[in-house]
Structures are given as C-alpha cells and as structure tokens.
C-alpha cells in the first residue's frame, strides 16, 4: 500500500507514547479493573468484559455523549476509531465509511441496533441509512461500536460497524432529568426522562423530547421539527428478566446539499432552501402535476419497538431471545444541484435578464443562477427481526447456538430531476423568462419510479470458545445464511413493471480469533474473518443488467486484525491493526447510469485512548491511519478509494475544577482530517481541515447543571464531499458552521 509508509512515523509515535504511559501505571491499576461489559459481538448478547474481548469495541456513555453534543446519531460516530463520517447533510442522510471499506454515500457497512436488535436489517437503501431512523436523546445510557471482529457471524451479519444503543433502565429509586436547550440559531428543545419501580421487580423508564428550529443553516422558517417518546419496561424474574420497549418518533429536518465553491457569499452558513422556494410543482409519470413542500426535508415518522427474554435454565444453559419491529415513513424532499453556478445571461431566453417568479424582481444578466432539481422520495419501510440463542459454559469451553431471522420490506415512490433555474442566493427564487423552468420535462434529466420489495433472511450460527491456558483463549464462529429478495419496479410511473427480481442466495461466514492475556489488565488479540453484504432492493435496480448476466451482487469482505489492549485504574489504551479486502463493490453515480464493479483493499491502524487523573484532568484520543487502494476496476485500478482520508485524529481533553464554590468542567475537542479524493478517478481533491469545539459545564446546586457548547469555534470552512452526482461541477458540501448551544437541566 503506497501511502501507509508516509504515515508510519505518526502511527509509531502515537503508539509509543500512549503504550509507554499505559504500562507505567502503578500496581494499584492491576487490582482495580474496569468492569465494562459489552454485549455486541457475543452470541445472543450475553455479554463479556471489555478487557476479555478479542475484538475492537468502543464504549461511549451518557456523560461522554453529553460532552460531545452530537448534532445527529451519525455525528456521534466520529468518536469511534476507524470511522469517517460525513454528517454535513443534516440530521438525516449521513455518509459513514468504515475502515476504508468502499462506498459512494449512505452507510452500506453500518448497522444501528437498539437493545441488541438491528433497527432495520438492510444497512442502506437509496436515500436511507440506519442512522436516519434513530434519534439521540436523554433515554440513551450507552453506545457500543464494534468494528469487524465476530460481526459477520452474529446478529444481521454486518461485516463492518455495528453500533448498539442501550436504553436507560429503571431501578428501585425514582430518578429523572428535565433539560431545556436553546442556541444561537433559534433552537428550542425540551428533553425529559423519568425512571423508577412500578411494583416489585417491575421497573420503568419513560422519556423523550420536543424540538423546533430554523436550522443551523437558517432557512427562514421552521425547517427542523421533531418529537420522540420512549418507554422501556423491565421485569426481573427469579431466573432472568423480560424487557420490552417502544420508541415513537416524528422528526424531520432540512436536507443540506452541495453548493457552488466558486461564488462569493456561498459558504458554510449558506442554504438554497428558503421561504421563496420551499413550495413547487413538479410533473411525474404521465405529466401528472404534484405540489410539494421541499421544507419537509429528510426525516423519520414511525416506531422502533421490541424486547428480549433472558433466562438461566437448568444444567447451566442460558437462553436469550431478542426481537424488534420497525414501521414508518422515511421520506426525502430536497433542492439538489444539477450542475454548477452559471450567469443568468447565458440561460435567459432574452440573453439579458429574467424576473423572479415570487417577488417580480428583475435580475440582471450578471446574476448567478443554478439549476436545482426538486427531488421527492416517499419511502414506507417495515421490518421484523428475531435473534434466539442458547449458550452454556463448560470447564474450559463455551458454546453458543443461535438462529437469526429477518423480514424486511420497502415501498418507494420517487420523482427525481425536475430541475429549474433559481437565483443563487439564500432562499433564492425560481425565475420566469427561462423556457425550461415552466416545461413539463424541466431543465435536465428525470427519473421516476414506483417500487415494492420484500426480503427474508434466515441464518443459523454458532460460536465456540476454548480456554487453552489461563492466558490463551481461542474462538471460532460459523454462520450459514439464506437470503431471499422479491422486488419489482415501474421506472416510468406508467403502470408497467420494467424490472422484476426473484432472488435467493446462501453464504457461509466465519471468524477465527485468539486472545492472549499478558497481565490481568493487558492483552493482545488476533482475528481473521470472512463475511458478506447481501443485496437488497436498490442494489438490483441499480445493477439490473449485471444481475441478469448472472452476478449475485454480493459483496465479499475478508478482514484481518491484530490488537493490543490495556485497561488500568485511570488509563485505557487500545490499538488495532486492520487489513481488509472487499470484492464485488458496485458504485452508481446517478440513478439510471451504469454500475462500476470494483475490488478495494485497505490497510491501517486505529487508536483508542482514555486517561483520567485524580486532579480532574481527562483526555480521550482516537486516531486512524489507513491506506486504501482500488485493486480491480475497468478504469481506476491503483487509485485510492473515494472520500476516504489517509489519516484522522480527534483529541478531547476535559478538566474538572471548582468555580466560586461550584463544580465545573471545561472541555474541548480538536479534530483534523487528511485530504481525500472526491471520486474514484482521483481527479477531485477534497482538502483536509481542522476543527475546534469548546464547552463549559457548571453545577451551581445539587442536581442543577448549566452547559454551554460551541461547535466549530473557529468557523472552519471544511469540505466533506464534492458533488457525487456531477463530479465535474465545482460544488461541495461544507461542514456545519459555528454554532453555540446553551442548556439548563435538573436531575433528581
């Protein structure tokens, strides 16, 4: 791998400094172990001590989440080593990349789970990735993030990143938090959570939020609105427990898209969406007019509900069954650029000027305009998953056997394209005097579909662990999965099915690992695995010709890991060297265009470090150094994978102190990222950038907390992506501009 040598000195320096500091901790650290339990990556989710886990997993608790102040679920994933997140599109619609795995957008190698169950079995559909249907609030107690490891064998078989969000639980004590948050962009948000005991051994937790704002990029109207309500009930039994929950969400926000990078005044605060253009009329199918409100943006209106049963049976057997039902609408409305900025005189019918269709303003020929597509995607989704497992511990052997089943459906109605010219300014209006603006066909291409799809997955898996010596543990896992898809699509909204799919495939995934304990608080692990990303509905639509030619559209993922771990009294340090190969990756730049079929490789190392001192100082560091390469491609062999940074680093120091008799914490985050290529051709360079965040927490009285948090303090104008639909257009999507939030909360 070509670039890895350039970063080896950085990686070596980080490893040397952090590991030396870790080893230097006193003997007390070896007696006081951090009993952090992780359930991700374990058969049936029984759980294992983090120090004993032979894989890379990161835990982020509610206290850390509060300090990170993420703007979305995907934004929180930036704190996970090995993960590159583009969260600049708003609360929904993030792009998440895992350890150099290829991707052109969305999050094909991310699974979001709640209480151990996937919220939606398909990691990504067009215009939908898992984080889009999950909202953070005060009901979350912990997030686990497992990369690689045994992932291909358990749960939905995700070979990349599985995040598991755990809900807060009730106890014998009644506890609660009420929190109000506002901001410099007009955010009004109220969070609440309450937990306690309903009766003997029956516990509850209820909570949620209500929010409204005009958006970090001010649209001039309430472009972000939402509410969520969660109930979590737990009944403790003599030999186990029963847990049920439901999470009801209705939350939408503006969809932020690439903007011209070569026009003055268009920066990180800019959004084309506004009062003068949120309403539009488009024509779909047989020239049927449709009135739309682009202000609805992207969102989720639905529920994620489920539960689990955990039992300790006779003869040392354990039983666990986890289930989940997800239903709702994940719609998308947006103003999507259809090319770069142009001068009005070059597109006006008279070659001189044009009139605003809303205000009647006459715009001169030197006014910048841009063709904008009015895109509509209506998506109804539903899924049901069940993961049942039996396990037993013998003298030196642990065995688990499980069966995972999933039923997944999606019904889509799209109208893409519908382009018209708008004045290039915040909230800029459409123009009269440009012929294509009023034509049924619009000013560019159009793509309309009506589709329905159902998928079924049935997998049998087993994991076996053998303690060869007091220090050495070996494990193996196998998974046999059958995946079926039935899908049809009408691509012209004329009632004729152009593409129909009746698909079935079976694959066997595996993992082999070894964990060696160097000391009670220190160890190393090694692992290899092979897994698969099975195709879902849009994979067939995008690659229908390839599918008809006999390609099963399955991405084959092979990984190897070598890791070091240390967990002392006040220091945690994890370093993981990873290597992976992904065969059969497909990339479609725009619906209707031919697919590119690629093989990608990545080699890298990730660091996860936490230090806490009795003086009140704490530091978290996560860093990733990686080299990616396209090893098989018709045109791009030898290039780097698009949108993948060679290195990134994130440092979060925090200091607790007394301020005028009050407990206080000052904290901040410095993050930096390397240059990236915006396309697989490596012709578009996205420059690296640095970002600073700063926050202060003050507790003037018991239970009362005041917090102020500044994001992007220096107002860095970083770019996360170019224009993936038109790489030649000088467009790009900025990171979010500087914003400041203030909250006051009371806990009891």
Question: What is each PLM-predicted segment?
Answer:
Residues 230, 234-236, 241-308, 331-375, ...:
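Acidic/polar loop-and-plug regions of large Gram-negative outer-membrane beta-barrel proteins
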Residues 671-679, 697-748:
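C-terminal beta-signal and adjacent terminal beta-strands/loops
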Residues 175-177, 181-267, 297-300, 304-313, ...:
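Transmembrane beta-barrel wall of Gram-negative outer-membrane proteins
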Residues 118-147:
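Short acidic/polar hinge/loop motifs at secondary-structure boundaries
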Residues 49, 74-118:
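Extracytoplasmic beta-strand/coil segments of soluble accessory domains associated
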Residues 73-76, 95-97, 112-113, 130-133, ...:
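N-terminal periplasmic accessory domains that precede
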Residues 35-68, 93-95:
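N-terminal periplasmic "start-of-domain" segments of outer-membrane beta-barrel proteins
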Residues 469, 572, 577-582, 588, ...:
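Gram-negative outer-membrane beta-barrel transporters
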């Amino acid at each position: 791998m070509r670039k890895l040598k350039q970063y080896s000195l950085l990686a070596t320096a980080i490893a040397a400094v952090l590991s030396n500091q870790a080893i230097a901790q006193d003997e007390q650290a070896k007696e006081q172990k951090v009993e952090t339990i992780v359930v991700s990556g374990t058969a049936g989710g029984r759980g294992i001590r983090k120090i004993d886990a032979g894989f890379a997993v990161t835990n982020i608790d509610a206290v850390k989440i509060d300090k990170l102040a993420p703007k979305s679920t995907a934004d929180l994933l930036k704190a996970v080593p090995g993960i590159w997140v583009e969260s600049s599109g708003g609360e929904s619609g993030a792009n998440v990349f895992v350890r150099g795995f290829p991707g052109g957008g969305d999050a094909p190698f991310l699974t979001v789970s709640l209480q151990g169950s996937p919220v939606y079995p398909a990691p990504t559909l067009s215009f939908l990735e898992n984080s889009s249907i999950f909202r953070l609030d005060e009901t979350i107690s912990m997030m686990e993030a497992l990369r690689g490891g045994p992932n291909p064998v358990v749960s939905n078989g995700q070979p990349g990143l599985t995040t598991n969000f755990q809900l807060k639980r009730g106890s014998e004590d009644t506890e609660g938090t009420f929190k109000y948050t506002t901001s410099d962009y007009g955010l009004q948000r109220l969070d609440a959570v309450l937990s306690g005991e309903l009766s003997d051994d029956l516990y509850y937790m209820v909570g949620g939020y209500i929010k409204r704002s005009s958006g970090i990029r001010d649209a001039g109207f309430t472009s972000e609105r939402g509410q969520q309500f969660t109930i979590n009930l737990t009944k403790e039994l003599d030999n186990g427990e029963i847990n049920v929950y439901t999470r009801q969400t209705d939350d939408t926000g503006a969809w932020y898209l690439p903007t011209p990078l070569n026009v003055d005044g268009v920066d990180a605060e800019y959004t084309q969406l506004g009062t003068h253009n949120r309403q539009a009329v488009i024509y779909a199918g047989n020239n049927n007019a449709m009135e739309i409100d682009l202000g609805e943006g992207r969102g989720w209106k639905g529920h994620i509900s489920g539960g689990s049963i955990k039992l300790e049976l006779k003869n040392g057997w354990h039983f666990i069954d986890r289930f989940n039902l997800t239903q709702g609408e994940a719609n998308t409305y947006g103003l999507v650029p259809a090319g770069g900025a142009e001068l009005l005189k070059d597109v006006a019918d008279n070659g001189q000027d044009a009139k605003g269709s809303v205000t009647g303003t006459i715009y001169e020929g030197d006014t910048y305009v841009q063709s904008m597509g009015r895109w509509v995607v209506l998506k109804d989704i539903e899924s049901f998953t069940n993961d049942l497992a039996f396990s037993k511990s013998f003298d030196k052997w642990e065995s688990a056997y499980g069966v995972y089943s999933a039923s997944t459906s999606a019904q889509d109605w799209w109208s893409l394209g519908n382009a018209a010219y708008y004045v290039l300014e915040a909230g800029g209006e459409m123009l009269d005097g440009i012929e294509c603006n009023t034509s049924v066909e619009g000013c560019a291409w159009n793509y309309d579909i009506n589709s329905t799809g159902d998928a079924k997955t049935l997998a049998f898996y087993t994991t076996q662990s053998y303690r060869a010596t007091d220090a050495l543990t070996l494990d193996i896992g196998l998974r046999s999965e059958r995946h079926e898809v039935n899908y049809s699509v009408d691509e012209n909204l004329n009632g004729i099915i152009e593409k129909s799919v009746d698909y079935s495939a079976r694959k066997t995934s595996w993992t082999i690992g070894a964990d060696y304990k160097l000391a009670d608080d220190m160890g190393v692990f090694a692992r290899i695995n092979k897994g698969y990303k099975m195709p879902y509905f849009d994979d067939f639509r995008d690659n229908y010709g390839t599918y008809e030619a006999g390609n099963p559209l399955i991405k084959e993922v092979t990984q190897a890991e070598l890791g070091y771990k240390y967990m002392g009294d006040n220091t945690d340090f994890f370093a993981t060297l990873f290597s992976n190969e992904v065969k059969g990756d497909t990339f479609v730049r725009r619906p209707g265009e031919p697919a590119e079929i690629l093989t990608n490789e990545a080699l890298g190392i990730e660091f996860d470090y936490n230090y806490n001192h009795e003086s009140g100082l704490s530091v978290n560091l996560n860093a990733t150094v990686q080299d990616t390469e396209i090893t098989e491609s018709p045109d791009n062999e030898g290039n780097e994978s698009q949108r993948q940074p060679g290195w990134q680093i994130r440092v979060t120091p925090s200091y607790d102190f007394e301020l005028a008799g009050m407990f206080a914490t000052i904290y901040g985050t410095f993050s930096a990222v390397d240059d990236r290529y915006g396309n697989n051709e490596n012709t578009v360079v996205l420059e690296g950038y640095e970002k600073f965040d700063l926050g202060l927490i003050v507790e003037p009285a018991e239970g009362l907390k005041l917090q102020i948090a500044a994001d992007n303090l220096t107002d860095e104008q970083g770019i996360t992506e170019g224009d993936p639909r038109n790489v030649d257009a000088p467009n790009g999507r900025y990171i979010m501009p500087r914003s400041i939030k203030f909250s006051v909360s009371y806990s009891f």
